[in-house]
UniProtKB/Swiss-Prot annotation:
NCBIfam families: argG (TIGR00032), PRK00509.1 (NF001770). One of its GO terms (molecular function) is ATP binding. This is Argininosuccinate synthase. Gene3D superfamilies: Argininosuccinate synthetase, chain A, domain 2, HUPs, Single helix bin. Pathway: Amino-acid biosynthesis; L-arginine biosynthesis; L-arginine from L-ornithine and carbamoyl phosphate: step 2/3. It comes from Streptococcus suis (strain 05ZYH33).
Length: 397
């Protein structure tokens, strides 16, 4: 009997490798691994899927698409979930879902499988995105169905010829892409424990970072970072370059107890050296170029967009509407920010823009001042009139 085809979001780790062995009894498994900048040995992952029993194995390089279509809107929004987390994992899930659906259409598969547990955010992100893109596709979640302890999973792996990774003893669960690295589990589950140094993989400890600061010039055109220190780079390569430079200086370490979509609190350790550097630089160019009303309203939109992305609603009309508003603000965001990297800090120390709204002649307190200070008297009188009237009325009562 012909089996149905199934697309598996494959990472090469134990969970999704065991999933191939488990699913191949009922499905023709097509493994799909996306390169979003995690730095894995992709050829090994491709071959591993086939050796376990997948009928096809695909590795897709989607770094530039990830950077342009998913990271860039978040950068331009200054998107932080709960004002701390730059949405590292949350941003990659809609792209991965989109590619899984495309592969299902290409191969005639009827089902998609992922390796998420039943208590995380990613199961929601994948399944809601898949439903938005093609409601006819079925979704299975083997790890959620098994409810196995790690020991039981290892036994199944060994009995079914699934290679057990050498780094399985690592206490941490790690997810990495261009925009950063997420670490959880192990001693991190106790929020009173300071994260040990072996938690971190792409940043130097600020205490051990260079004793001399490094300055980086980041150029933006229409809100898009296009060059580092005068060198033009694709967006994906630019982010990777800053991950290395800023990571060396210990920039971008975040310790966050966050409210998960599924209703629990989770302690996460993030490393986002490139992201924090770019977010900091981009904000300073906006401060120079956006009118006050846009500057004051934009954070409200950004906060709502951050929540939508975190909660798995990338493919939602509300997300589209907010992204459209934010994109409209970026035409004037041109210029260069000089960022000082030093022992965990990324600080903009200078900025310039051809669209700058900063007028030194108006701002100066020297004799070159062109600001009409005599106009202040009338302005204050009119601006304060409602406050004055309110005070007078309440004083009478």
């Amino acid at each position: 009997m012909t089996k149905e085809k199934l697309i598996l979001a494959y990472s090469g780790g134990l969970d999704t490798s065991v999933a191939i062995a488990w699913l191949k009894k009922d499905y023709d498994v097509i493994a799909v691994c996306m390169d979003v900048g995690e730095g894995k040995n992709l050829e090994f992952i491709h071959d591993k899927a086939l050796s376990i029993g997948a009928i096809e194995s695909h590795v897709l390089d989607v770094k530039e698409e990830f950077a342009q279509e998913y990271v860039l809107p978040a950068l331009q929004a200054h998107a932080y979930y709960e004002q701390k987390y730059p949405l590292v994992s949350a941003l990659s899930r809609p792209l991965i879902s989109k590619k899984l659906v495309e592969m299902a259409h290409k191969t005639g598969a009827t089902t998609i499988a992922h390796g998420c547990t039943g208590k995380g955010n990613d199961q929601v992100r994948f399944e809601v995105a898949i439903a938005a893109l093609d409601p006819s596709l079925k979704v299975v979640a083997p790890v959620r169905e098994w409810k196995w302890a790690r020991e039981e999973e290892i036994i199944f792996a060994k009995e079914n010829g699934v290679p057990v990774p050498a780094d399985l003893d690592s206490p941490y669960s790690v997810d990495q892409n261009l925009w950063g690295r997420a670490n959880e589990c192990g001693v991190l589950e106790n929020p009173w424990n300071e994260a040990p140094e072996d938690t971190f993989g792409i940043t130097t400890s600020p205490e051990n970072a260079p004793d001399t600061p490094e300055y980086v010039d980041i150029e933006f055109k229409a809100g898009i970072p296009v060059a580092v220190n005068g060198e033009k780079l694709s967006l994906a390569n630019l982010i990777q370059r800053l991950n290395v430079i800023a990571g060396k200086h210990g920039v971008g370490r975040i310790d966050h107890v966050e409210n998960r979509l599924v209703g629990i609190k989770s302690r996460e350790i993030y490393e986002c050296p490139g992201a924090i550097t770019l977010l900091t630089a981009h904000k300073e160019i906006e401060d120079l170029t956006l009118v006050r009303e846009v500057s004051h309203f934009k954070p409200i939109v950004s906060n709502e967009l951050s929540n939508l992305i975190y909660n798995g609603l990338w493919f939602n009309p509300a997300t589209d509407a907010l992204k459209a508003y934010l994109a409209q603000t970026q035409a004037v965001v041109n210029g260069t920010a000089k960022v000082k990297l030093y022992k965990g800090s990324a600080k903009v120390v200078a900025r310039k823009s051809p669209n700058s709204l900063y007028d030194e002649d108006l701002a100066t307190y020297t004799s070159a001042d062109t600001f009409d200070q005599d106009a202040a008297v009338g302005f204050i009188k009119l601006w304060g009139l409602p406050t004055k009237v309110n005070a007078e009325i309440h004083k009478k009562s």
